[in-house]
């Protein structure tokens, strides 16, 4: 129902989606002419690359749910995916920047480089060679890579604020780094996902050690919490920032992916690491520990305890 509502009420004639800063969650990102339109409350007459990618992702998930439930696929969703992927890869992609961009009302790419284009990874819109270019941008300290993770606005863009990030004018957000890391892994770029996750998780952990809390956003230039209008963002913000020290730590730093009756473990760390007394959805209580290694070439030694049998695949 929500997907249909968005399709009926938040699309342009070509089927691409629009929103506002508050609507898309990136409150004050300067993606439009802010001398004419409110970044927070207006669509600026542009096609939002992030919302368009999210709707592709949502449509694909709805089709997957239909398959699991054994019900007929909605052909309109299949048609929408095909149409939007065509626009994304023919119009939103910029070969010069190696990024996906918003489109203006004439169908031209908006030059502002922001984090929204990386939703192409999670939505599986980017072909392999473009996914690799996106991964390169994510590792580039001159644009998106920061000590805390991924800048919401590329360094050097008009409106970028190096001191605290001023929310979405450069600030690093756990929720967007989670989407990006999961997107990289979904595209098979596990090493890139692990490296970004390590940088982000370690930064969030360091700030927690320094301040005793998890923050709403993080600084784009140094390892500390973010700011909004010169003041600290909200502390104790586990509501979505908790995804980093929990889910990202387990899945992309430790490298554990849990499926029913099975754990796939992509071991990347040299330190002794793992989880003890984890209750799986089927009630099985497991402990998985990888012992310390001296090098990446050394074969991992893994100890597993569980209440009942399950499979562990080590990669």
Regions found by a protein language model. Give the residues of each.
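Internal metal/ion-chelating core segments
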Residues: 31-69, 74-89
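Alpha-helical scaffold segments in carbohydrate-active enzymes
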Residues: 1-12, 54, 61-64, 79-94, ...
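Short alpha-helical "patches" and their helix-cap loops
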Residues: 129-143, 194-201, 256-273
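Catalytic cores of secreted or luminal carbohydrate-active enzymes
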Residues: 233-274
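Beta-rich accessory regions
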Residues: 72-79, 83-88, 95, 185-195, ...
């Amino acid at each position: 129902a929500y997907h249909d509502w968005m399709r009926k009420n938040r699309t342009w004639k070509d089927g691409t989606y629009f929103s506002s800063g508050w609507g898309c969650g990136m409150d004050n990102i300067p993606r439009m002419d802010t001398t004419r339109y409110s970044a927070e409350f207006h669509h600026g007459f542009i096609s939002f690359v992030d919302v368009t990618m999210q709707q592709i992702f949502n449509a694909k998930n709805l089709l997957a749910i239909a398959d699991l439930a054994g019900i007929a696929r909605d052909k309109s969703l299949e048609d929408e995916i095909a149409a939007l992927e065509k626009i994304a890869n023919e119009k939103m992609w910029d070969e010069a920047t190696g990024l996906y961009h918003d489109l203006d009302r004439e169908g031209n790419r908006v030059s502002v480089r922001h984090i929204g284009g990386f939703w192409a990874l999670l939505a599986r819109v980017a072909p392999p060679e473009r996914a690799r270019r996106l991964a390169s941008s994510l590792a580039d300290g001159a644009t998106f890579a920061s000590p805390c993770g991924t800048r919401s606005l590329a360094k050097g863009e008009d409106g970028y604020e190096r001191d605290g990030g001023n929310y979405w004018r450069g600030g690093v957000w756990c929720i967007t780094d989670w989407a990006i890391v999961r997107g990289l892994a979904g595209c098979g770029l596990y090493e890139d996902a692990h490296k970004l996750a390590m940088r982000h998780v370690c930064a969030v952990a360091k700030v927690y050690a320094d301040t005793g809390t998890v923050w709403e956003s993080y600084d784009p230039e140094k390892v500390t919490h973010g700011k909004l209008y010169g003041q600290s963002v909200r502390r104790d913000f586990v509501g979505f920032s908790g995804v980093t020290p929990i889910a990202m730590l387990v899945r992309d730093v430790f490298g554990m992916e849990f499926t029913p009756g099975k754990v796939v473990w992509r071991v990347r760390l040299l330190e002794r690491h793992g989880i003890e007394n984890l209750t799986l959805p089927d009630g099985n209580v497991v402990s998985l520990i990888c012992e310390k290694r001296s090098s990446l070439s050394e074969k991992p030694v893994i100890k597993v305890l569980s209440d009942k049998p399950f499979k562990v695949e080590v990669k």
